[in-house]
Amino acid sequence: MAPHLLHVFSTFKLGGPQRRFVQLANAFGPSYRHSIIALDGQTQASSLLSSDVEAQFLTFQPVKGRLRPVANLRAIWRLLSEQSPDLLLTYNWGAMEWTLANRFWGFAPELHFEDGFGPEEADGRQLARRVWTRRLAIGGRSGLIVPSRNLATIAGETWRIAVENTHFVPNGIEVERFAGAAAGRCAIDGGVVVGTVCALRPEKNLGRLIRCFSQLRDLPVTLQIAGDGPERLPLEWLVRELGLADRIQFLGHIDDAAPVYAGFDIFALSSDTEQMPYSVLEAMAAGLPIVATDVGDVHTMLSPDYKSSSVVPVKDEDGFTEKLRQLVRSPSGRQAVGAANQQFVRQHYSLERMVDCYNRLFQRAIDRGKHNRLPAAMAQTAA
């Protein structure tokens, strides 16, 4: 029987961690069985799973109130005992209670993923409570997986996670799917399309992108924003306030982003915090030049030949605007930078490389866990 993997997400709405899981599950096919918990009950990303993926969604209702910590830990222990997974995989801060529960009782070998930070830690300052919780929870039995060198450094220097327990695995992508969709790219009515793809959340700081775009009124350029989220209404209000409603389009939620990238001429990333954003890899695969804030590993992801023309300090809106302006004015420049980005992502960020790396990590953790599992009687007592 295929090994049983239990995945715990704060949400299974489509985002970077969910997109990566879908890629891996589809690539693994029937090699693993998956049980998935979305703590908020949202499971929209499940529609992207292939038919040969054996996956079930489990319900878990976190307890709220004064007795929450003890009640939740007991409920987690009970579910882990019932499911008896060969490997527990927990994703980001929202699943940290599960890592804590498994830390002390060792129901299953575990790999914990950290993909980045929300707006409360976007400025690089770590919240002390979270630092200590991560040290305690991840620092025991769990292996830690991070997609960026920046996070690997934080894990060692701030969270004090042992180097041998920290695994840096860059995200990978189906390059040809995006390259093929973009092969027929052509200008729309002679104009240039700047685009971005992201969840409309505060840390994405799309207000910055809109303000920078507003300085390009003298050029034949439009802006397309693909994605949805809580910031949409404030952003639409900002667009109207700046008198840009006829030049900025909100595309809403997108299931298949490849055709969307094919309609862009330039990709823009205006985030306050990222680590290794999938959107940048997708834009590179689509052969796009990129203007981005210098967050996470973005400066190492892009073609080294054009980093200086692509990345600006986070708060440098004038610099961001100027790099957009230069690319809008230069069709040959866009083509050269986009081609270099596409070649670089092919060489360094293939899906095949990522899948192979994760398969080896999963198998190693499962094999190690066979010798270190909590005895069934103790598991029942804990639950």
Protein language model features and the residues they cover:
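N-terminal strand-loop element at the rim of the active site
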Residues: H7-G15, R19-R68, G229-P230
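A conserved mid-protein helix/loop that constitutes part of the nucleotide-sugar donor-binding site
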Residues: G15-Q23, V192, T196-Q215, P230-W237, ...
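A conserved nucleotide-sugar
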Residues: S31-H34, L206, I210-F250
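Short His-centered aromatic/hydrophobic patch
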Residues: T90-M96, E114
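Carbohydrate-associated surface elements
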Residues: N150, G172
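Aromatic "clamp/platform" in nucleotide-sugar-dependent glycosyltransferases that forms part
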Residues: H253, D272
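Short hydrophobic beta-strand element within catalytic cores of glycosyltransferases
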Residues: P289-A292, L302
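Conserved acidic donor-binding segment of nucleotide-sugar-dependent glycosyltransferases
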Residues: P304-D318, Q326-P331
